[in-house]
């Protein structure tokens, strides 16, 4: 029998639109934009099953609940894609490519910015689980069969303790309250993405200005200290010459 570990106390640590099953199961199921029978999916052997409608906060919640349970080694992505947000494609891109400057590399979603997960959190997710992509499938029979197939391949718990992440919902991105997120048109998605990029660029410029001001201040201070030391040395030399 595969070795198991205790998930974080009170797992799942982040609340959301999902059901839970056996926490020792190696499989988590994300139904993306579809509302399937998550209870039946958990009865088929999943540790946790539910939707994920946004490519930012939604993904953060999924990842937080996965890495806080070392027993989960597979994540099945299924159900329909969410128009504009593309949470399924974004999750796959994050697992494959990671995040650069807070943005999911390779994501085609509207606002693919991760604000609550550290580089260590993302690396842990990439190392802990294998993604199994059956996107657009809503067939409970096919999903249940995939759960059984992966359970038979259970490699045992990940070789590290549960990793706990705090998810703050007041950050940018679309909320998932009530499990309802309005799909975005391509035009609206593009506007949201550009607004987010501009916001981050402005923030980066502010940090650069502070850094440049600090460097300039340090140079001036160093110059003054150098002049003072030079005057002291010259004074000592003149005094010594007068004495001799």
Curated annotation (Swiss-Prot):
Pathway(s) annotated for this protein in UniProt: One-carbon metabolism; methanogenesis from CO(2); methyl-coenzyme M from 5,10-methylene-5,6,7,8-tetrahydromethanopterin: step 2/2
Residue spans crossing the bilayer: 223-243
Membrane topology summary: Single-pass membrane protein
Keywords noted in UniProt: Cell membrane, Cobalt, Membrane, Methanogenesis, Methyltransferase, One-carbon metabolism, Transferase, Translocase, Transmembrane, Transmembrane helix
Binding site for 5-hydroxybenzimidazolylcob(I)amide: 85
Reactions catalysed according to its record: 5-methyl-5,6,7,8-tetrahydromethanopterin + coenzyme M + 2 Na(+)(in) = 5,6,7,8-tetrahydromethanopterin + methyl-coenzyme M + 2 Na(+)(out)
Keyword Transmembrane helix attributed: yes
Co-factor binding details: Binds 1 5-hydroxybenzimidazolylcobamide group.
Gene Ontology CC terms: plasma membrane
Subcellular location: Cell membrane
Extracellular domain ranges by topology: 244
Single GO biological process annotation from the record: methanogenesis, from carbon dioxide
Topological domains annotated Cytoplasmic: 1-222
Phosphoprotein recorded as keyword: no
Molecular function as annotated in GO: cobalt ion binding; tetrahydromethanopterin S-methyltransferase activity
Protein family (similarity comment): Belongs to the MtrA family.
Subunit structure: The complex is composed of 8 subunits; MtrA, MtrB, MtrC, MtrD, MtrE, MtrF, MtrG and MtrH.
Name of this chain's protein: Tetrahydromethanopterin S-methyltransferase subunit A
